[in-house]
Amino acid sequence: MEAVKTFNSELYSLNDYKPPISKAKMTQITKAAIKAIKFYKHVVQSVEKFIQKCKPEYKVPGLYVIDSIVRQSRHQVGQEKDVCAPRFSNNIISTFQNLYRCPGDDKSKIVRVLNLWQKNNVFKSEIIQPLLDMAAGIPPPVVTPVLASTTVAMSNTPGTPVTPVTPANVVQGLPDPWVSQITNTDTLAAVAQILQSPQGQQLQQLIQTLQIQQQKPQPSILQALDAGLVVQLQALTAQLTAAAAAANTLTPLDQGVSFNKKLMDRFDFGEDSEHSEESKKEIPTPQLSHVSESVNNSIFHQIAEQLQQQNLEQLRQQLLEQQQPQKVTPQDSQEGAFGSEHSASPSQGSSQQHFLEPEANLDDSIDIQQQDMDIDEGQDVVEEEIFEPEAKKVAVRSRSRTHSRSRSRSPRKRRSRSRSGSRKRKHRKRSRSRSRERKRKSSRSYSSERRAREREKERQKKGLPPVRSKTLSVCSTTLWVGQVDKKATQQDLTNLFEEFGQIESINMIPPRGCAYVCMVHRQDSFRALQKLSSGSYKIGSKVIKIAWALNKGVKTEYKQFWDVDLGVTYIPWEKVKVDDLDGFAEGGMIDQETVNAEWETVKTSEPVKETVQTTQSPAAVEKETVVTTQSEVFPPPVTMLQIPVAPTVPAVSLVPPAFPVSMPVPPPGFSPIPPPPFLRASFNPSQPPPGFMPPPVPPPVVPPPAIPPVVPTSLVQPPLSMTPETVKDVGFGSLVLPGGSVAGNLAPSTLPAGNVFNPPSKAEPEEKVPHLTEHQIPSGENTRPVIPSDIPSSAPMLAQPPGASNTSGILCVQRPNVSSNSEILGVRPANVSNSAAIMGAQPPNMLNNSGILGIQPPNVSSGSGLLGVLPPNLPNNSGLVGLQPPNVTNPAGLLGTQPPIGPQNLPPLTIPAQRMPALPMLDIRPGLIAQAPGPRFPLLQPGIPPQRGIPPPSVLDAALHPPPRGPFPPGDLFSQPERPFLAPGRPNIDSVPNPDKRIPLGNDNIQQEGDRDYRFPPIETREGINRPPPVDVRDVVGRPIDPREGPGRPPLDGRDHFGRPPVDMRETLVRPGLDHLGRRDHFGFPPEKPWGPRDFDEREHRVLPVFGGPKGLHEERGRFRAGNYRFDPRSGPWNRGFGQEVHRDFDDRRRPWERQRDRDDRDFDFCREINGNRLGRDRIQNTWVPPPHARVFDYFEGATSQRKGENVPQVNGGNTERHAPPPPLPVQKDPELYEKLASSGDADKEESGTAAGVESEAVVESTETEGT
C-alpha cells in the first residue's frame, strides 16, 4: 500500500502545478502507478476520484494520467494481460461525465484522446463511441432521449462545425466512389454486427413496436409514437453507425479532416471540390460507407416506409413545438445515418432561416404551404432528393427546407447521381407537379451553382477573400514579418520571399524586429503567407512570424474595416470616397468584383467629355494626327485643369495651356513628356532647333459646308446653334494655344471659308486689301461681304463691327492659298509661313460675346496671337484679345498693342526666315516650339477680379504679360514667381500708354523686339538659372547661325544692340566662342587691339547670368558662344515675362546685388580679384554716368521702353545691376572713354571672359531706363 500512497501523493501534487502539466511530471505519476500496479484497483479508483473532485482545469490532466497509465501498462505486460484498461472501462461513462465538466476549450483535447484510443485500440469502439457522443452532446443511452436531442441541437448550430469529430458525423461525408466499391458481404457483415450489438437489439425492438402500432388502426398511435420515441430512434441510430464506423481503421485525424471538409461542403463554402479531393486522398478506407449504406437500405428504409404510411400531422406539430427554440433540428447532426427523419423534420422551414440569404424570404411562403406535403410524403422527399442531388445543393442557398435536407442526405443520395432513384419515384404517392417544379428549379440552379463554385475556387487560388455584398474589398499584398533577427538584412528577406513572386518593396524596422514585405501580386503574398506560417522558417537565428499587414493605401478612417485574418479591408460602398479609390491600391489591390459600377462612370465621365470634342471635328483630328508624331498623352492629372467652357465663361482659357487628356496625341507645342515646371524642355536631336521650321505644308482641304461647327480653340464663343453641352465638351486644352505657334490651334481648323471674310463696311480692312493683293488674294474668296443671314448658323466666327451686339464676329482676311478650312484667322500674308493671326480684342464697352478683329501686321515673325486683357465689362467674351480694332478709341482696355492706323503701319511682308510656322505645325516636334503668349496668360486686365478657374497668381501675373507677338517655349509655362495678383508689371512694358515705343510697326529694318525677346531668350538667361540644359542642346540650338542671319533679316543683336548694323553683330558672334575656349583673351581679343564698339559690352553681359549659377555649366555655355550668340539675344528677350527675367524683376535674391552699387567706393583693384569683376564694374558704371545718355538714345531710338523690360535683372544676380545708374556700355563708342575703360578694365576682362559682355549689356538697359 505504500506504493499506492506514493502514487496518490504524486497524483494530487498535480494541483500544485499550473496546467499544462509537464511531461516530466506525467512520467513521475505514471512510474508511481506502475509501481503500484498490484493495487491497480486502488490506482484506478484514485484517478477516478481525482477527476471527479479536481478543478475543471485539471480534468484533462486527469485524463492524461489515465491515458499514460493504460498505455504504459499495456506496453509492459502486453494487451492481453493489461488490467488497467478493463478496470478503467468499468466506470468510464461516469468518469467521462466528470471529464466533460472541463472548460469548453479542453473538450477538443478529450476528443483527441478518444480518437487516439480508438485508433490504437486502447479501448473497444463500443466503449469509445458513447464517449465521443457525449462530447457531441449525445448522452449515453441511459439518459433520457428527449433531453439528448435538445442538447444535440443546441450544441450543433449550423454554420459552425461540430466540435466533436465523431464517426457518426464522419459517415455523413463519404464520397460516392467509396460507396460504389462496397461489396455485399461487407454490407451484410456490418448489418449483422450492428444488429448483434445491444443498441441494435434496442433498435429492432423499436421497429417491432412500430409495426405493432401500425397494424392496430387505433388513433392512439400518435400518443404511443411520441417525440421521445423518434428522438430515441435517432440517437440509437447515430450510436450504431458510429460504432460500426469505429471498427474500421480510419484514423481519428483523418476523420476530423474529412468531417470538417464534408461539413464545409454541406454548407457550400465553395471549397468542396478541393476538399473532397483532399479527403479522398486522406481517407483511403472505403469501408465506412458500408455502414451508412446498410443502415439506410435495410433498417431505416423499413422505418421510413412504415412511418410514411401514418398520419404524422400531430406528431409534426409536437416536434415543431419542441424544436422551435432550437436553431437546428437534431437530425442535422445525425441525419447522415438516418434516412427517415424527414418524417420527423418538420421545422425545416422555420428553424433554419438564419441560413438563408436574402432570396430565402421569397421561398418561405412556399415552404410553409408545402410542409404538409413534405412531411406526409416522408420518404418521397428523400427519393426525390436522390433523384436531383446536386441541384439541391444549390437550392440550399435559396430554399430553407432544401438546405436542411441537403445537409442530411446520406451517401445514398450521392451514389445515385446516375438518377437510379427515378425507378422508385414511380411508386410514390405525391404531387407530381411539385416534383417537376423542383426538378426544373434544380436543373436551372445546378449549372449556375457549379459556375459559382468554380469562380470561388479561382478566387481562392488567387488568394482573394470572400466577396461581401455592397462592400469594397481592398486586398492587402503587404505581409508583416515578425521576430526578424536584428542582424537580418533586406537581402535575407528578399531571398526568402522572392521564391513566391515579385517583391514590390521591403520595409525593415530593425528596432522592432519586424519588416513589411509588399508583394506585387496578391496571389504571391497569399502563397507566401500560407507556406511561411505553416513551417518554422528562420531568418538569421530566429523563427519568423508572418501575418497580413494593412496596406499603405488604406487611410486611417478605413482601418476599422480591416480584417487581419483575411488580409482585406471590407469598406462598405457608402463609406468609400471615389477620390480615395486610386490610393487604396498602394501596397494592395482592389478586388474588381467588389467595385461599384457607378464609381467607374463617375471617374470616367470627365475624360469622356473630352473625347467628344476630339471626335466631333474630323478635320481637326485629321490635322492633329498629321501634326504630331508623339504618341504619349499627358497624364490624367491634367484633367483636373479642364474647365468646360459654358456660355458664361470667357472662351479663352484662364489657365495655363493644357489639352484634353483624351486627345490621341499631344498638341504640337507640348514636349512628349512635360519638362519640370521651370526647366526648358530637353533637346530632341530629331527635331530642328526652334528657329528652323520645316517648310509649310498646306492644311488638308475640306469642303466648307460639311464641317461641324466645333472650333477646337474656342477663340470665339460658339454661335447659338451650339448647345451649351457641346461647348462644355470642348476641352479647355483646345481653348488655349498649346504649341508655340498660333498656327495649329489658334484658329478653328474647321472654319468654313464663308465665315472668314472681310466685311467691306470696315475701313481699315479695306485699307489692308491693297497689301494683300500683292499676294494674290482672290477678292471673291476673302473680301466678299457676308451678311449674317447668309452665314450658316453654325459658323464659328463672324465678322462684325466691334460695337455691334451680335454674338459673333471675327474680322479677318483669309490667306488666299490656304484651303477653305484654313486654321489661320486674320491677315495671312502669302509668303510668311509663320505669321499666325493676331486676334483683335473686343472694345471694352462691348457687352457681347465675340466680335474679334483679326488684324495682323504681317511682318511680326513670331506670329502668334497677341494676348490682351479682356475688358472688364465684357460679361461673356470669347476670343483672344490682341490688336485693338482700329475704331476703338479706348486703348486702355487692352493689354496689347497699339491700334493699327492703316496700311502704312503694316510692315513689309517679307520675313526671310521662318520664326514660327503659320500653318498647322505639321512637322514641328512638340518640345521645341515656343509657346504663344496668348494661351499662357489669362486675358485679365489689371484690376479685374480673378475668375473662378484661374490658377494662382504666380502663374497668371498680369504684370508679366509678354509684349505682343511672342511665342514662348513650353518650358516657360509656369515660371512666373509668386507675386500679388495683378501686380503692376515691369515699367513701360505692359502699360499701354506708350504703345508707340513698343512696336515700331512701320520700320522695315528694325527687328521687332517683342518677337525676339519672346522667341529666343538668350540662352544664359533662359537656361542659366532655372534650367541648365545639356551642352548638346545648347550646341545644336546655337550652331545653325547662318540661316537665321539670312539675307534681309533684321540683325538679331543682343538685347542692347537693337538698331545696330548686322555686320557688327556677326563680328561679335564669332568672338565670344573663342573666348570661352580659354583662348579668347589671347587670341580672339588680343589685349593690344582696341575693343570693338560692342565687344566689351557683350562680354560683360554674357557673364552675368553665369554669375550666380554653377560655374561648370556657365563656362561650357560660354564656349559655344560663337555659334550661339545669335540666338541668345533673341531668345533672351523672348523670356521677358518668364524665365530668368521674371526672377530678375521680382525675386528677392536680386536685392543684394543691387546693393553692391553702394559698395562702389571700394578699391577698384579689389574688384579684379572677384569672379565676374562685379564690384569693379559697378564702380566704372558710377564713374561714367553722364556720358551714356546720348548714346543710349542713339542706339535705341524707339525702343527704350522695350529695352528696359527685356533686360529685367535676372535671378541669382544675373544682370542684377540693370538698374545700376549709368552703364559704361554706351560709352564704348566714345574712343576716349573706351580707352580708359579698356585700360582700367583689362585685367577684369582677362579674368572674366565673356562675363564682361553680358553684364555691360545689362548696364546699357538700366541706363536707358534711367534716361527715360
UniProtKB/Swiss-Prot annotation:
Residues 477-551 form the RRM domain. It is found in: Nucleus; Nucleus matrix. Residues 1-139 form the CID domain. The modification Asymmetric dimethylarginine is found at R915, R925, R936, R1071. Keywords: Isopeptide bond, Methylation, Nucleus, Phosphoprotein, RNA-binding, Transcription, Transcription regulation, Ubl conjugation. The modification Phosphothreonine is found at T6, T615. It comes from the Eukaryota. The modification Phosphoserine is found at S273, S617. Residues 322-355, 385-469, 753-808, 947-1063, 1199-1268 are annotated as: Disordered. SMART domains: RPR, RRM. Residues 961-970 have a biased composition (Pro residues). One of its GO terms (cellular component) is nucleus. Residues 342-354 have a biased composition (Polar residues). Interacts with POLR2A; via C-terminal heptapeptide repeat domain (CTD) phosphorylated at 'Ser-2' and 'Ser-5'. Identified in a complex with CDC5L and other spliceosomal proteins. This is SR-related and CTD-associated factor 8. It comes from Rattus norvegicus (Rat). The lineage of its organism: Eukaryota, Metazoa, Chordata, Craniata, Vertebrata.
